[in-house]
Curated annotation (Swiss-Prot):
Phylogenetic placement of the source organism: Bacteria, Bacillati, Actinomycetota, Actinomycetes, Kitasatosporales
Name of the protein: Lanthionine-containing peptide SapB precursor RamS
Propeptide regions on this chain: 1-21
Gene assigned in the entry: ramS
Region (Disordered): 1-21
Disruption phenotype: Single deletion of ramS leads to a severe delay in aerial hyphae growth. Deletion of the ramC-ramS-ramA-ramB operon on rich medium leads to an initially bald (no aerial hyphae) phenotype; after 4 days develops a substantial aerial mycelium. Wild-type mycelium on minimal medium. No expression of SapB, normal expression of chaplins. A complete chaplin-negative plus ram-negative strain (deletion of ramR or the ramC-ramS-ramA-ramB operon) leads to the complete loss of robust aerial hyphae.
Amino acid sequence: MNLFDLQSMETPKEEAMGDVETGSRASLLLCGDSSLSITTCN
C-alpha cells in the first residue's frame, strides 16, 4: 500500500482533507494501481 501513502502525501491536504481517506481509496479501486489515480479519478 505504498502507492496509497504516496498519493495521499501528493494530494493537497487543504483540498482533499476528507477525500484522501474515501476518495483515494475509491479511485484506487476504480482506476487500479496508477500513480495518478487520484488526479485522474477525482
